Regions:
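Basic, low-complexity intrinsically disordered segments
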Residues: 1-171
Length: 171
């Protein structure tokens, strides 16, 4: 069997294609994570709103889980536990007043370089009704597993915001 002889540029060409493929995979994974975070926020919001509006109890989560798993048998993420986490995710970050004070408090304790970034965050938060959109965009930058870690380990909104920002900036 003879080995084909390729142009000397072939290794560089192959390396460039591999890099492009890896970049596309990373970009796609980020897009999926972003959409999942937004979906889970929306599901959590919808559950909370229906429970408040119609007086539904916690058992609706078990029913929703069973129905969604039946409708989407090849998809994961709709277990009762995960759906309760979606509700908790929404409740943890939905109250705008929770974010104004911690952001302002945290910005006072940061170095001057970081303080400028936090002032921008505070300014954005003070431009309600854009606050919810701003928070949604911040939350969408972070994979679901990271959100669960933050929710499970931290209860203080200031600490949560710090770790959300750090995760969004540093990955």
């Amino acid at each position: 069997m003879t080995k084909a002889v390729f142009h000397p540029d072939y290794p560089a060409f192959l390396a460039a294609l591999k890099e492009r493929i890896l970049h596309a995979r990373t970009t796609a994974a980020r897009a999926v994570n972003r959409e999942l975070a937004l979906l889970y926020w929306d599901i959590g919001r919808a559950i909370v709103e229906k429970q408040q509006l119609l007086g539904w109890g916690e058992s609706v989560i078990d029913r929703l889980s069973a129905d969604l798993l039946g409708a989407f048998p090849h998809m994961s993420g709709f277990s009762p536990r995960n759906m309760r986490d979606m509700k908790r995710f929404y409740l943890a970050y939905s109250d705008e007043s929770i974010w104004r004070q911690p952001v302002a408090k945290l910005s006072k304790s940061l170095s001057s370089d970081l303080n400028q970034n936090w002032r921008q965050v505070v300014a954005k938060l003070d431009q309600s009704p854009a606050t919810t959109d701003f928070l949604r965009q911040l939350l969408a930058q972070i994979p679901w597993g990271q959100h669960l870690l933050i929710l499970n380990k931290l209860t203080d909104p200031t600490a949560r915001l710090y770790y959300l920002r750090a995760t969004a900036q540093l990955g």
